[in-house]
């Protein structure tokens, strides 16, 4: 990262780092503090880092690594803009003495005030009735009762809550079969929704743990530029092959009148 990415160049980072040795990533590990410091260096003022992470349970206790990492990001100068929850629709085999574990944290860090906020408004309001006006009364200062109509301010769809339930697992995280050669699939929907929320077209999206290339793919699909780094050559090859297949497919579509995103790596 130090050699290839300049200071204050990244608009948005969306990533899910390896955590607590829950999976074997070909024997590789990472230095968290060094990674966090580099993310602060390369992030633009107003840029955002989406850090998706969880904790493992060891000897009856959760490690708490996620909280320690969040506090370290704050020590570096990041704001903790939001603590969101990624709720999975599939679960791992449960322990006998605790409730089913179905979520991970999505920490939203910003370097100063976020410069881009596009809140997704796709939550159906259950009280919406379609009426344009609501009848009512109010009293003047002298006590006189006056009948009036006021505009119905309740919209059909509202901004979603900060707990996102996103399908994950086989044929849910992605339909790209090659991606499942990676041990931990990052759901495309999760990456896409954060990209839409915290960046605009033409912005640079970064993933320092690119894995199978999900963040890069969704950035390209949504007309963002992308940068990805990956220490494992095997996973880097998977990501490149996946993105190559995507580019070939959509070049064919381009000839049929589809407008394609410009892909940068």
From Swiss-Prot:
GO biological process: one example: methylation
InterPro entries with a match to the protein in the record: DNA_methylase_N4/N6 (IPR002941), MeTrfase_CN4_CS (IPR017985), RM_Methyltransferase (IPR001091), SAM-dependent_MTases_sf (IPR029063)
Top-level EC class as recorded in UniProt: transferase
UniProt keywords, alphabetically: DNA-binding, Methyltransferase, Restriction system, S-adenosyl-L-methionine, Transferase
Reactions mediated catalytically: a 2'-deoxycytidine in DNA + S-adenosyl-L-methionine = an N(4)-methyl-2'-deoxycytidine in DNA + S-adenosyl-L-homocysteine + H(+)
Record field: transmembrane: none
One GO MF term attached to the UniProt entry: DNA binding
Pfam families in UniProt: N6_N4_Mtase
One GO location term (cellular component): cytoplasm
EC code(s) of this entry: 2.1.1.113
Domain of life (superkingdom): Bacteria
Remaining remarks: This methylase is encoded on the proviral phage H2.
Purpose of the protein: A beta subtype methylase, recognizes the double-stranded sequence 5'-GGATCC-3', methylates C-? on both strands. No endonuclease has been identified for this methylase, although it is speculated it might protect against BamHI.
Similarity comment: family membership: Belongs to the N(4)/N(6)-methyltransferase family. N(4) subfamily.
Protein known as: Orphan methyltransferase M.BamHII
Taxonomic lineage from the root: Bacteria, Bacillati, Bacillota, Bacilli, Bacillales
Gene that encodes it: bamHIIM
């Amino acid at each position: 990262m130090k050699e290839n990415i300049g200071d204050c160049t990244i608009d948005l980072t969306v990533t899910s780092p390896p955590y607590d040795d829950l999976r074997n990533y070909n024997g590789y590990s990472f230095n968290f503090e060094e990674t966090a410091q580099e993310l602060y260096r390369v992030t633009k003022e107003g840029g955002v880092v989406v850090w998706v992470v969880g904790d493992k349970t060891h000897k009856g206790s959760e490690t708490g690594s996620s909280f320690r990492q969040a506090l370290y990001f704050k020590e570096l100068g990041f704001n903790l803009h939001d603590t969101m929850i990624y709720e999975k629709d599939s679960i791992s085999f449960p322990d006998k003495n605790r409730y089913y574990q179905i979520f991970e944290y999505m920490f939203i860090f910003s370097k100063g005030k976020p410069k881009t906020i596009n809140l997704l408004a796709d939550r159906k309001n259950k009280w919406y009735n379609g009426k344009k006006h609501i009848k009512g009364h109010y009293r003047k200062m002298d006590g006189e009762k006056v009948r009036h109509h006021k505009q119905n301010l309740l919209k059909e769809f509202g901004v979603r809550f900060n707990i996102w339930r996103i399908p994950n697992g086989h044929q849910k995280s992605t339909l790209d079969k090659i991606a499942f050669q990676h041990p931990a699939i990052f759901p495309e929907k999760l990456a896409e929704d954060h990209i839409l929320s915290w960046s605009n077209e033409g912005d640079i999206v970064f993933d320092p743990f690119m894995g199978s290339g999900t963040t890069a793919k969704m950035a390209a699909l949504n007309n963002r530029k992308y940068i990805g780094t990956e220490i494992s050559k095997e996973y880097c090859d998977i990501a490149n092959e996946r993105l190559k297949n995507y580019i070939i497919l959509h070049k064919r579509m381009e000839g049929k009148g589809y407008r394609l995103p410009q892909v940068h790596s």
